[in-house]
Amino acid sequence: MNKAIVFDLDGTLVDSAPDLMDAHNYVMQKYGYHQKQVSDIRHLAGRGAANMILSSLREEDKKFDANIHKKMTEEFINFYRENISKKSQIIKGVTEFLKWGKSNNIILAICTNKTESLAKKLLKEINLIEFFDYIAGADTFEYRKPDQRHLTNILEILDVKKENSIMVGDSETDAETARSAKVNFILVNGGYTEKDQKHIYHDHLINDFT
């Protein structure tokens, strides 16, 4: 009987907000907009690059050009790709927990709204990629979180039943995905969300992986 743990990436396994902030501020400054602090980025990071830039643009310019948004998003991704792990830190206890999972024959997977290539690049550069049996990004399927199929497709590919799986994430996007899929959900406290954790659906709440 296969068992699996499916993880979100940003804010769950890795504090990637500092590198995301640098990419965000690079494009915002280039196009004449205000920069943000890392705390602001933590509230936006779980939505993907396009939505992050979109939120910032809407704060400053209600009539911005859609083509500018597209170009800024592309430049954000290009900058981020080249600087993806300069400041990112693995969250406390993650490496030891993943080692425990592998030693107990638990299938480990990633379900992230990062593109698949960026997710794999980050995991490789922080030396975590070896632990994962499957990595699904925002562009792996035709849908992404909070669409439950992002998660259920992973489980089908891995041949794991829902009742034998757990999802671990840090935001309402992850929570909605797990709840819709009827998969038990562990919420990581202090993640990339604007909501108070007590208002986010979860079966269990943890502060880190120790």
Predicted regions and their residues:
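Active-site neighborhood of HAD-like aspartate-dependent phosphohydrolases
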Residues: 1-43
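Asp-based, Mg2+/Mn2+-dependent phosphohydrolase catalytic module
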Residues: 1-3, 39, 99, 116, ...
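Conserved SAM-binding loop
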Residues: 6, 13, 90, 108-111, ...
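An amphipathic alpha-helix signature
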Residues: 21, 25, 46-54, 73, ...
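Phosphate- and divalent-cation-binding pockets in alpha/beta enzyme and binding domains
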Residues: 23, 52, 93, 118-121, ...
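Alpha-helical substrate-recognition element adjacent to the catalytic core
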Residues: 28-60, 66
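Metal-dependent phosphoesterase signature
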Residues: 31, 56-96
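Short, acidic loop-to-helix structural element flanking the phosphoryl-transfer center
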Residues: 81-110, 116, 120, 145-148
